[in-house]
Amino acid sequence: MSIEWIQGACAVPDARVQAAALARQEQLTKPPGALGRLEQLAVQFAAWQRNEQPTVQRIWIAVYAADHGVAAEGVSMFPQAVTGEMVRNFARGGAAIAVLARELGARLEVVNLGVVNDPGELSRVRRAWIAPACANICEQAAMTPAQLRDALAAGAESIAQARTCGTQLFVGGEMGIGNSTAAAALSCALLSQFPQAMAGAGTGLDAEGIAHKATVITRALAVHADAATPLERLRRLGGFEIAALVGAYIAAAQAGIPVLVDGFISTAAALVAVHLNPGVREWLLFGHRSQERGHAALLRALEAEPLLQLDLRLGEASGAAVAIPLLRTACALHNGMATFAEAGVSDA
C-alpha cells in the first residue's frame, strides 16, 4: 500500500444544512447568541452530519500505543516498560480513558503498534505491530519509509472500522513513554520554535528534567536539520502512534467524520495532518488546552480555540473525552428548545 491516499480529497460540510441550522438557532426562545459557543457547535455538527438535528451518540475512541527509542535519553519519569503495562490496563478497563469511554457509551479501540514490554495478544487490543519501538531520534530517523506507511495505515484502519458503525465523532489518543519529546521535536521543526519553548513536564519532569529534555530535542533537530517536508519530518522525528494519529485524522476528514483532538501530542499530529492535507482542518475540533508547555503554540498555528482548560496533561484522549458532554448538550439544546412561534413567545 502506498501513502498517496493521504492527499485524497476531504469531504465538505453541507452549507445548506449549516444555513438551516443557523436559521433555527435564530428562532429559538433566547436572545440571539445567548448560548454562545454552544450554538456554534450545534450548527457545526449539523453541517458535518448533513442533518439539521445533529446528535453526538456514536463515538469511536482509538488509543495508539508505541514505544520510542528516545526514551533511552532519560526524558521521562517512568520506565519504558510502562507503555506495555498500560496497554494491559487499557484492555482491562482500568485506565482513565477506559472509564471515560464507559461513562460516555463510546467504543474504545486500543491499538498496539509496538512496545518493548509486549503484552502479547489481548482480546480487546488490535495488534498492528510494526517494531518494539521506533528508533532514537537523536541518532537516526524514527521510522523507515515502510514503517511510516504502516503506521499511517493503522490509523486509517480505525476510520474504516468506525465508518461501518455510523460513527458520528472520532477521538484519537496515544500512549508511549518518550512521546512528548518526539512531539515537541516535531513541533519545533514544523513551527521553527526553540526546544525550550516546546519541551514540557510530560510525565512530571522537574525544571532540571525539562532542561535536559530540551537539550535532547536540540540534538535531534540537529541530526535531522535537512528534513524539508512535513512528511519527512514526521518520519524522522515522530513515532508510530503519532503517525497513526495523522493517518486517522486524514482518513476521518476524507470520510466526513468529525474529529475531537486531544492534547499536546494529538495536536502535534493534527498539525502534521493539516500540513499534508489542508482539507483536514475543517473537520477538527479541539477538546482542551493542555498544561503541557508547547500546546498553546500548536493551537495558535491551527487557529484553534479549545473547549476546555482544566490543566490536564494525561493524554490517552482523556481531555477530549471530558469535553464530549458539552457537544451533546449543544445538540440537545439545538434540537429540543422551542422556537418563538412554537412557544407563543414574542420575538424581539
UniProtKB/Swiss-Prot annotation:
A Pfam entry, by short name: DBI_PRT
Documented EC number(s): 2.4.2.21
Active site positions, chain numbering: 316
Coiled-coil residues: none
Enzyme class: transferase
InterPro entries noted in UniProt: Nict_dMeBzImd_PRibTrfase (IPR003200), Nict_dMeBzImd_PRibTrfase_bact (IPR017846), Nict_dMeBzImd_PRibTrfase_N (IPR023195), Nict_dMeBzImd_PRibTrfase_sf (IPR036087)
Keyword Cell membrane: no
Keyword Transferase attributed: yes
Domain of life, per lineage: Bacteria
CDD domains (UniProt xref): DMB-PRT_CobT
Pathway(s) this gene product operates in, as recorded in its UniProt entry: Nucleoside biosynthesis; alpha-ribazole biosynthesis; alpha-ribazole from 5,6-dimethylbenzimidazole: step 1/2
Keyword set, alphabetical order: Cobalamin biosynthesis, Glycosyltransferase, Transferase
GO BP terms, alphabetized: cobalamin biosynthetic process
Catalysed reactions, as listed in the record: 5,6-dimethylbenzimidazole + nicotinate beta-D-ribonucleotide = alpha-ribazole 5'-phosphate + nicotinate + H(+)
A GO term for molecular function: nicotinate-nucleotide-dimethylbenzimidazole phosphoribosyltransferase activity
Function, as annotated: Catalyzes the synthesis of alpha-ribazole-5'-phosphate from nicotinate mononucleotide (NAMN) and 5,6-dimethylbenzimidazole (DMB).
Family in the record: Belongs to the CobT family.
The protein's name: Nicotinate-nucleotide--dimethylbenzimidazole phosphoribosyltransferase
Gene source species: Xanthomonas campestris pv. campestris (strain B100)
Species lineage: Bacteria, Pseudomonadati, Pseudomonadota, Gammaproteobacteria, Lysobacterales
